[in-house]
Every structure is written in C-alpha cells, then in structure tokens.
Amino acid sequence: AECLMIGDTSCVPRLGRRCCYGAWCYCDQQLSCRRVGRKRECGWVEVNCKCGWSWSQRIDDWRADYSCKCPEDQ
C-alpha cells in the first residue's frame, strides 16, 4: 500500500493511509465547543495534522461544561 511522505498534511490520526518510514500522524490540539441539546461541551479537536515524529497528546474526550463559550454565545 502507498504511504504518505513525511510532512504530508493530508493524514488523519488513527485512520487512512499510514505515514512512510514508521512516522505517524501528529496534530496540534485546539479547544472547541459543541452543543448537545441545550447543554454545551468543550473538547479538544486535532488540527494542523502532518506525518512526522513529533508527539502530541491525544485528547479525544468531550465533557459537559456550562462555562464553555460557543461562538454563537459571544
């Protein structure tokens, strides 16, 4: 199977084609907000992903947070 070259930004963590040379897809974490019914949850989403050897913490959990500001709350 074809692999993605180092620095390729089309990679998706845990999915899709693997990065070449044993590298992995790593990303920056960005705080995000989503609505679930009437409540809000804050969570971390992965952005600026690319193939390489740097390591970033995987934060996939969303948690209810009423102090979280969604864009439409501004």
Curated annotation (Swiss-Prot):
UniProt note on tissues of expression: Expressed by the venom gland.
Modified how: Contains 6 disulfide bonds.
GO cellular component terms given for this protein: extracellular region
GO molecular function: calcium channel regulator activity; toxin activity
Compartments in which it is found: Secreted
Record keywords, A-Z: Calcium channel impairing toxin, Disulfide bond, Ion channel impairing toxin, Neurotoxin, Secreted, Toxin, Voltage-gated calcium channel impairing toxin
Biological role stated in the UniProt entry: Potently blocks vertebrate calcium channels Cav1 and Cav2. Is the most active on Cav2.2/CACNA1B (from HEK) (IC(50)=2.3 nM), followed by Cav2.1/CACNA1A (IC(50)=4.3 nM), Cav2.2/CACNA1B (from oocyte) (IC(50)=14.4 nM), Cav1.2/CACNA1C (IC(50)=26.8 nM), and Cav2.3/CACNA1E (IC(50)=96.4 nM).
Name of this chain's protein: Omega-filistatoxin-Kh1a
Species of provenance: Kukulcania hibernalis (Southern house spider)
